[in-house]
């Protein structure tokens, strides 16, 4: 349903949002780390999981955000990516801000998204001294989201364009767990390193 809704969305890119690639990059990284990986629906029970990735989940059913918050509060690690929580199950936009229902848990709020041309790219530059210990610079393409940070830790920042210095990866301890927010379509190498450290 999320894929259908994305294909019907009018923007931010008129062609190919690269949703399947976003999911596949994370799946590949997790499998290469030896993690058993399930692809589940929004109705699925989350109690048996320690790590949950929510890649480009444009559509959030009513109540799904609360379920994700509870997962993190109870000790889970939640990884949310850009362009998530924009519409409900009837494809109506949430008006309270995005990612809907997760702004407090993630410690961020989406301001806008930049759709890059196919030949354009930006870079994700690590913050010195972040708890992840990532030191590489990574390429990001296609979609780059701009977020306002309320109380999240910034782990990486954009390297160029009008949003140079803005957050591209954030973290917030939430309850007994953790919430990470990935603001851009990152290259495969990023996910390999990131999931090796979370």
Predicted features and spans:
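Carbohydrate-binding surfaces of carbohydrate-active enzymes
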Residues: 1-198
